């Protein structure tokens, strides 16, 4: 039926319209576009809302052999009486939820100025495809709600219901469940509607901090929080906290946006906690920013830190290649004792410590802005799928809904007839805050550069004994995405919003892209090359990052 076999030469498909790559002009530019001409009186209004979509009263099973995977001979609760197990499937494959640890939520922040309305919506999910994003944007709840664009992203929380479809009861059966998706769509749309309709005049207090072991020593490493476990070790440990307060009462929070790059996953690898639905550390980070952190809860709280209230929206960052809290990370728990065992306790410590750092930075060096111009630009483009596994997943309807273009579906999928994914990237600026989206797990060097070791934080840049080392001579040259965000007039605080506007897996830079010569996309190449197995293909950087750079350089 198809002949995709990987190991492509990277040559363009024969006969493919060159316009598939990149874009000509953004399709949304505000203010100044046909539906958002004016900035009005220049007053920024901000609204925020949240809704849970946590499954309730769902079917569970008895894990008789203790392998954390459901087998067809294991008993289950057949609540709907249809004779089959309709579980809530989690990341990993055949892993059905048994209980709930934390709520999973959709959280929205709306920005309104003159004719422009933009929303940042982040959902506790591993990832969301374009078809799901469209169903949220077109939800009946939003009929009549005037929004120029909704940026939709996922926190990448692993032990949330499978929204991609990759991790069902067997490799060929989707993990997507209609009752879960319907609840997610409804929750997301309701959060957007409330955020827009409750927007009120706002001011901004904003700060950053580095989540490294000793902020006064850039070489002090980062293993109180996370690590980069793929060479080269390059990542951005910056946490940005943007608190929007009422213009009429600057002591009262409307909502807060927090950005930091880290995989939410540690309890997934626990022998005891991994079958429970949870948002992982983002739940605790959001809660502690709102409610506060005591000195007893975190060594990073020098004194008891009051919460700032409101609703906190967490936006994940450039976490590809692998930025996470595994393999030797030891976040300090209550009393400062390092936590070395993965599980819910570690999730809570990561979120609590990050919140303590955020609240401290805001109190110590928060910068206030009352003039907050709002602008938005967004463009669509396409990226080619060469990954055999993704071909199969789309062909058998394993993955969620997503249009495919640039190929003939009646012919075999092969070099010369690869499908392309329509994608989108968006740049949003709110005063000094500049945010750009990436449609997956962006490798951090594509965000910051850092090939000279300047973004390695005391870790060795490379282990020279590993095979298939990166070719730094072929690495991208500046300016990098972060540089181009900062190049916008007035921007002091750059943010990369990962897993946003779509989800394409890992966005691996071409200079360090290696496939197994015998079984590409099925077996990872020797060395640090797991991420290639879950990427679009060798041209992933060219097709996804270059249009983002193009958008960032666009000026009307």
Which role fits each region the language model picked out?
Residues 16-153, 161-311, 315-349, 355, ...:
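Conserved beta-alpha junction segments in alpha/beta enzyme cores
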Residues 6-9:
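Bacterial signal peptide processing site
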Residues 2-4:
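C-terminal motif of bacterial Sec signal peptides marking the signal peptidase cleavage site
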